[in-house]
Amino acid sequence: MSESYDRGLVADFGRWTEFSAGMWAWVFHKFTGWVLVGYLFTHISVLSTSLQGAQVYNSTLSGLESLAIVRLLEVGLLAVAVFHILNGIRLLFVDLGVGLEAQDKSFYASLVLTGVIVVASVPTFLTGAF
């Protein structure tokens, strides 16, 4: 049985600089997954206001949509969702053995495509916010 050794806090803190593209893809995929789970609970809590009537639900939505920070968070949610979807498709292909030798390139392509989609969508989300 192998034993781990204590490298010290300074050495452990600097390990993130040694991450490869595959490790960053894993970290981002886990992070975006947790963000989406958190959003799901927020979404359900907003939808639950409809149980109190249409007026309460509509006033809740109009109140949230009038806040600029909510509009910015929607753009962030779009970025998180698009990256998670694209990286998930990339992982599916890698698991099937397609593109194994180009994993790094496909990860960077998913980042670029996420950026393009989000930048193209910004006017839709921020219209009337400011």
Swiss-Prot record:
Q: Does the keyword Membrane apply?
A: yes
Which residue stretches are annotated as topological domain Cytoplasmic? 1-25, 94-103
**Which Pfam family is an annotated match for this chain, by its short name?**
Sdh_cyt
GO terms, molecular function: electron transfer activity; metal ion binding
Keyword check for 4Fe-4S: no
Cofactor field: heme
Query: What is the UniProt remark on how the cofactor binds and its stoichiometry?
Result: The heme is bound between the two transmembrane subunits.
Q: GO biological process: any one?
A: tricarboxylic acid cycle
Keywords assigned: Cell membrane, Electron transport, Heme, Iron, Membrane, Metal-binding, Transmembrane, Transmembrane helix, Transport, Tricarboxylic acid cycle
- Chief location: membrane
Record-listed heme binding positions: H84
Listed SUPFAM superfamilies: Fumarate reductase respiratory complex transmembrane subunits
Subcellular locations according to the entry: Cell membrane
Residue ranges, Periplasmic compartment?
47-71
UniProt pathway:
Carbohydrate metabolism; tricarboxylic acid cycle
Please name the Gene3D superfamilies in this protein's record.
Answer: Fumarate reductase/succinate dehydrogenase, transmembrane subunit
Looking at the UniProt entry, the stretches that span the membrane are 26-46, 72-93, 104-128
The annotated topology with respect to the bilayer is: Multi-pass membrane protein
Oligomeric state and partners?
Part of an enzyme complex containing four subunits: a flavoprotein, an iron-sulfur protein, plus two membrane-anchoring proteins, SdhC and SdhD.
Entry protein name: Succinate dehydrogenase hydrophobic membrane anchor subunit
Q: Which organism is it from?
A: Halobacterium salinarum (strain ATCC 700922 / JCM 11081 / NRC-1)
